[in-house]
Amino acid sequence: MSSLIKEIEEAWQIKGQLLQDSSKLIMLKKTLNDVIASLNQGAIRVCEKKENSWEVNEWVKKAILLYFITTESQLYNNNYNSWYDKVAPKFSVDTDENIFKEAAIRKVPGAVVRTGTYIAKNVVIMPSFINIGAYIDEGTMIDTWATIGSCAQIGKHCHISGGTGIGGVLEPLQAKPVIIEDNCFIGARSEIAEGVIVEEGAVISMGVFIGSSTKIIYRDTGEIIYGRIPAYSVVVPGVLPAKEAGKPGLYCAVIIKQVDKTTRSKVSINDLLR
């Protein structure tokens, strides 16, 4: 792995000159294809949890960006659509049926998954878009018209509801993508962006918009936090009243309750939100 990282880092330093050196370009393309294949298999990932902290593997981001620089667009076709892109689809009309059967993946018409994306076992992909570098763990549902941004990390047994936007990020290199940990529910038409971390077991109601500067308020105490939804929190949209009379209030996300793991597993999402 160290030699692979070294090669990517060296190529990154001369990225503006790569297209002018055909011999280096040929060697680099093979390396980049290996990185994309490893992303597809989940052998490497853009961001991973180490000792309770999420860390970005910047070299993987660099490899993806180099892949864009060194790859020419081409025409792709399937049975009902065609498109012109630098990134191939993860699944094509030639994909062996056994790949889906062995992994128990269900992918319906209209679902777009770019290569360089990891899709684990028992994932259901409705008509949606999943970008390069994303990681979708076991048993998760990506519902209709959801968008999973580049490098976004989605945990096990999550439900990403219809029309939801999960932000991704390739640049700046050190920035974290959005991270949705295990057993989370993200309500329909919500948007989680700008590197926000939704910790394990959290429930986000329909229509909640959270970015890095969004005020996240504990309803009981009034405490305000940013960029993180604590584990097993239940969150709804709200408005923070203006301090001055007659001034408009500002949007916020409100933590209305926190439950333990046992309660979360036994109580329905609808009951939690009520």
From Swiss-Prot:
One of its GO terms (biological process) is lysine biosynthetic process via diaminopimelate. It is found in: Cytoplasm. Substrate binds at R106, D143. Homotrimer. It comes from Rickettsia akari (strain Hartford). Gene3D superfamilies: Hexapeptide repeat proteins, Tetrahydrodipicolinate-N-succinyltransferase, N-terminal domain. The lineage of its organism: Bacteria, Pseudomonadati, Pseudomonadota, Alphaproteobacteria, Rickettsiales. One of its GO terms (molecular function) is 2,3,4,5-tetrahydropyridine-2,6-dicarboxylate N-succinyltransferase activity. GO terms for cellular component: cytoplasm. This is 2,3,4,5-tetrahydropyridine-2,6-dicarboxylate N-succinyltransferase. It is an enzyme of class 2 (transferase).
